[in-house]
């Protein structure tokens, strides 16, 4: 029975968050006043001031970007930036999508009223004027662990509601995510946040858009625009000094995920598990191969290692090895198009969404990862498969690389073919890295590893899926027992996805000369038809 379950307004009093870093005193206040009548404030800055000294903030970290008139401008972190913040409302309440629909809707209305979201609440009142019978919830398909809804009410702008998963497979560093959202908001990027609750948030819903498809990605004109859009992202959001000097976030995540998998000793010691899913003889062989690949990339590769060894730092910065703020997951569901004809779409009509994996990486990681997505068709019956025949041909990659380099070129000088060739080769050398990233993600998401509490410092990011057009939506309905299982529509074959990625990973390591083609420890391999250009 769910009688009297729904939240009352007094249970959900709002707090206001200022996105940045909280002092211990502020954190203590927050805990003491979670259910008080007056909102408390938490100061979280656009950039984490704990990561900077005054010297760091005075050092210019210039980034080139364009203004609304298309003119070149520069920006950098300054002491003034460190004092900027994003003001967010927060309410101490949880929403449970497993409740019967009418109770769930009433809880949503109560939280919306407490957050005082304009239009969705009555100013100065504890009671909402909204009728739960007129509220429509439409669940967005494709989110693999988080539950995402479009909320519609007559004559009100629709909202997007995310309810975070609470299992080990949906653990995300929400504190870092808040800082990322704050930074994106400072540059008018990312989700337009309306308010937070304990296990989720409300965002502005992007009307009149559709998610991109595999066909969009492989279209030459569209691919050029995507390259330019990525360049704009990379040139808009500066990194902190710490982010520039630390190792790329991809390697940090690898360390965390491998440590997590390795902690399941019974699973990793079973060579049948390893052979079936990682396409090799043993866990030890996998670990050795991963270390050998990383060592090869930084010490012996033809282009990455050469650029890192050069004294001319400009050569490295102008290549794909420059550390930038990356999206790290630009797949079909995370790129929205304004609903126009394909020929009418401009770079400004593209919107990148879902920054849960965003962070500092070399340019080449973002580019190589995106081009891998040409092989995926998440709308296909076999959505886990990697269609290797769809991977971009040499000319496609060269055009993509040239479009990226030439866009927002400060000197308006056409880039030499040598720089395009270098970026092309970096994309190939880093391709195993981006393949393996999502292979391990899929293994952790599969549920085949026994669940256990995370070791301190570990984090497992999730939700490799997007949102957008109405074809990815379904009505929220109750099961016969009055409960709604938000996972019942999740039929993605994680282990199949893992195996497909591993086959390409091993094929790449053979082609690049990291391991021998006749190595008896490797199982099924797939080979992509691109080679380095010398």
Curated annotation (Swiss-Prot):
Q: Which residues form the signal peptide?
A: none
- Known catalytic reactions: ethanolamine + ATP = phosphoethanolamine + ADP + H(+); choline + ATP = phosphocholine + ADP + H(+)
Keywords attached to this Swiss-Prot or TrEMBL record, sorted alphabetically, are: ATP-binding, Cytoplasm, Kinase, Lipid biosynthesis, Lipid metabolism, Nucleotide-binding, Phospholipid biosynthesis, Phospholipid metabolism, Phosphoprotein, Transferase
Stated induction or repression of this protein's expression: Induced by zinc-depletion via the transcription factor ZAP1. Expression is sensitive to intracellular zinc levels. Repressed by inositol.
Keyword flag Phosphoprotein: yes
Cellular component terms per the entry's GO annotation: cytoplasm
Give the modified residues of type Phosphoserine: 23
Q: Which GO terms describe its biological process?
A: phosphatidylcholine biosynthetic process; phosphatidylethanolamine biosynthetic process
Q: What is its EC number?
A: 2.7.1.82
Stored SUPFAM superfamilies: Protein kinase-like (PK-like)
Regions that span the bilayer? none
Tell me the route in metabolism or biology where this protein functions.
Phospholipid metabolism; phosphatidylethanolamine biosynthesis; phosphatidylethanolamine from ethanolamine: step 1/3
Its subcellular locations are:
Cytoplasm
- Top-level EC class: transferase
Which GO-annotated molecular functions does the record name?
ATP binding; choline kinase activity; ethanolamine kinase activity
Function statement = Catalyzes the committed step of phosphatidylethanolamine synthesis via the CDP-ethanolamine branch of the Kennedy pathway. Also exhibits choline kinase activity, thus contributing to phosphatidylcholine synthesis via the CDP-choline pathway, but its preferred substrate is ethanolamine.
Q: Which family does it belong to?
A: Belongs to the choline/ethanolamine kinase family.
Q: Beyond the main fields, what else does the record say? A: Present with 3420 molecules/cell in log phase SD medium.
Q: Report the protein name in the record.
A: Ethanolamine kinase
Q: Which gene codes for it?
A: EKI1
């Amino acid at each position: 029975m769910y009688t009297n379950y729904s939240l009352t307004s007094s249970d959900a009093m709002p707090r206001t968050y200022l996105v940045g870093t909280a002092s211990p005193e502020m954190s203590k206040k927050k805990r003491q006043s979670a259910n008080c009548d007056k909102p408390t404030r938490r100061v979280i800055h656009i950039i984490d001031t704990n990561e900077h000294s005054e010297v760091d903030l005075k050092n210019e970290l210039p980034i080139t970007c364009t203004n609304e008139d298309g003119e070149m401008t520069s920006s950098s972190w300054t002491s003034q930036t460190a004092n900027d913040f994003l003001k967010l409302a927060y309410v101490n309440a949880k929403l449970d999508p497993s409740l019967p629909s009418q109770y769930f809707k009433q809880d949503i209305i109560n939280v919306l009223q407490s957050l005082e979201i304009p239009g969705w609440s009555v100013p100065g009142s504890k009671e909402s004027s909204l009728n739960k019978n007129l509220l429509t919830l439409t669940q967005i398909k494709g989110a693999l662990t988080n539950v995402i809804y479009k909320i519609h009410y007559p004559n009100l702008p629709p909202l997007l509601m995310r309810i975070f998963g609470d299992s080990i497979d949906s653990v995300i560093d929400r504190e870092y995510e808040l800082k990322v959202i704050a930074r994106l908001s400072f540059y008018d990027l990312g989700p337009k946040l309306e308010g937070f609750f304990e296990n989720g948030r409300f965002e502005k819903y992007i009307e009149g858009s559709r998610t991109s498809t595999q066909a969009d990605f492989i279209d030459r004109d569209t691919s050029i625009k995507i390259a330019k859009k990525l360049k704009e992202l990379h040139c808009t959001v500066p990194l902190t000094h710490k982010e520039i000097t630390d190792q790329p976030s991809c390697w940090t995540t690898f360390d965390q995920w491998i440590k997590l998998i390795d902690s399941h000793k019974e699973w990793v010691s079973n060579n049948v598990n390893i052979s079936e899913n990682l396409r090799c003889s043993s866990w030890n062989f996998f670990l050795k191969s991963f270390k050998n690949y990383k060592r090869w990339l930084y010490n012996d590769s033809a282009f990455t290692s050469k650029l890192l060894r050069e004294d001319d730092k400009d050569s490295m910065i102008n290549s794909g090895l420059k550390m930038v703020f990356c999206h790290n997951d630009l797949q079909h569901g995370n790129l929205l198009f304004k609903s126009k004809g394909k020929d009418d779409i401009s770079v400004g009509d593209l919107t990148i969404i879902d920054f849960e994996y965003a962070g500092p990486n070399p340019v080449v990681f973002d580019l190589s990862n995106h081009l891998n997505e040409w092989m995926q068709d998440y709308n296909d019956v076999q959505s886990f498969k990697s269609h290797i025949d769809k991977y971009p041909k040499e000319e496609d990659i060269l055009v993509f690389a040239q479009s990226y380099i030439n866009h927002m070129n400060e000197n308006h000088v056409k880039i030499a073919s040598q720089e395009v060739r270098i970026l092309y080769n970096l994309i190939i050398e880093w391709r195993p890295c981006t393949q393996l990233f999502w292979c391990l993600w899929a293994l952790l998401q599969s549920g085949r590893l026994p669940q256990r509490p995370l070791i301190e410092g570990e984090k497992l990011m999730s939700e490799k899926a997007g949102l957008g057009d109405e074809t990815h939506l379904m009505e929220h309905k109750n099961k016969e027992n009055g409960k709604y299982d938000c996972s019942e529509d999740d039929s993605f074959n994680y282990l199949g996805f893992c195996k497909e990625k591993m086959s390409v990973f091993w094929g790449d390591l053979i082609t690049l000369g990291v391991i021998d083609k006749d190595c008896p420890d490797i199982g099924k391999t797939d080979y992509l038809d691109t080679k380095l250009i010398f």
